[in-house]
């Protein structure tokens, strides 16, 4: 099975999103290495009881992978919504 082409719509956004992920997951209580923020998925997987390992994880179910990705992505989305609401409230009525 081919791997998806995972590119952000905005060129160069990758580093900023990785920093954002690290910041959000640190606030959630996870130990995040700033040089390897993507590795937080292993800590999340361990907490959820998902046997995620570096390398091939073809033995994992979609549900298991979704639990890990959902925990990380959901936390990021909640923080983006919170930031947007904060910016809108600071802007005031138009």
Residue ranges and their predicted role:
Residues 1-94:
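A charge-rich, low-complexity, intrinsically flexible signal that marks solvent-exposed coils, linkers
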